[in-house]
Amino acid sequence: MTAGVTRFATAITRLPCKNAVDGLRAVDQGVPSIDQMLADHADYCAVLASAGANVITLPALPAFPDAHFVEDTALCLPEGVIFMSPGAPSRFGEVAAMRTDIAHLFSETHQIFPPAHIEGGDILITGTEILVGTSDRTNAAGVEALTRIAANWGYHVRTVNTPPGVLHFKTDCSLLDDGVVLSTQRLASSGCFSGFKIGYHCFFTFAKINGQKKVFCFGCP
């Protein structure tokens, strides 16, 4: 397992397409603004670049409204890339496009195929293991396929349960650094983060990016 999993040299992003407003939704909160999405995406890329990352921005895919969620279709590791097998039928075609766009960046490539299904939003890579939450988008066969590939690179994969009603495992958690996880109480109470410091509470701060005021949320252990 590579140390320093929270430190990255390169970030891969994809521009939201105009059809992104028609993307899948776990909860219907109204029609999003594509102009706001594009502005937020630009700010996101700017922050990554300011932190020293080489930001690769892939072109929008009009046929796939959810394609800007790039982590769901490709798990990028120092040893290579594993192309995922999305659990939502409308996202199947994203994988081929992602493979065309980024496969050349990696020395080794693998792909998971149906009936195994797994999405990157259910995968949390820590400094000691890879946690995968089963969900409506990730099944046991998908976890098994990932486990076989990752084992060849020295990674241990552990399966955990995503709480009912939660789209992805990482909807309820995120890695703050190699030893600290920001999590909801309902997920942390399952015991899946044993051995980690857990942040439950949040505070907010404001910063200006490109002259606009933005709000940021941080977790406190």
Q: Positions of the model-derived regions?
A:
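The feature marks the mature, well-folded catalytic cores of soluble enzymes
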Residues: 1-221
